[in-house]
């Protein structure tokens, strides 16, 4: 008779839910105040003019305008600003 022993258990098989991080509004796009621009872990992007930073480091628009990405400062940090139209 053909027999097969019971398979052993495994300690794998779990993964966390994706957090949907990343840039939500790109350079040159028009945004309204309150729009989320970037969802991030830590400050990969820093808040420039007319941009606020939430407690989870989410960057959001504080005014209506166009999104502008820029690299500035001695540490070449990436800043996101809103330029009023």
UniProtKB/Swiss-Prot annotation:
GO molecular function: structural constituent of ribosome
Glycoprotein keyword on record: no
KW Lipoprotein (keyword) present: no
Listed GO biological process terms: translation
InterPro entries in the record: Ribosomal_bL27 (IPR001684), Ribosomal_bL27_CS (IPR018261)
Region described as Disordered: spans on this chain: 1-20
Superkingdom classification of source: Bacteria
Keywords tagged on the record: Ribonucleoprotein, Ribosomal protein
Classification via Pfam families: Ribosomal_L27
GO cellular component: cytosolic large ribosomal subunit
PANTHER family: LARGE RIBOSOMAL SUBUNIT PROTEIN BL27M, RIBOSOMAL PROTEIN L27
Homology family: Belongs to the bacterial ribosomal protein bL27 family.
Protein's recorded name: Large ribosomal subunit protein bL27
Gene field: rpmA
């Amino acid at each position: 008779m053909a027999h097969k022993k019971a398979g052993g258990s495994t300690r794998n098989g779990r993964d966390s839910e994706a957090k949907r991080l990343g840039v939500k509004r790109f350079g040159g796009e028009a945004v309204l105040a309150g729009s989320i621009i970037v969802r991030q872990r830590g400050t990969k992007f820093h808040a420039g003019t007319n941009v606020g930073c939430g407690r989870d480091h989410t960057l959001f628009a504080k005014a209506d305008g166009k999104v502008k990405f820029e690299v500035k400062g001695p540490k070449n940090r990436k800043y996101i600003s809103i330029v009023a139209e």
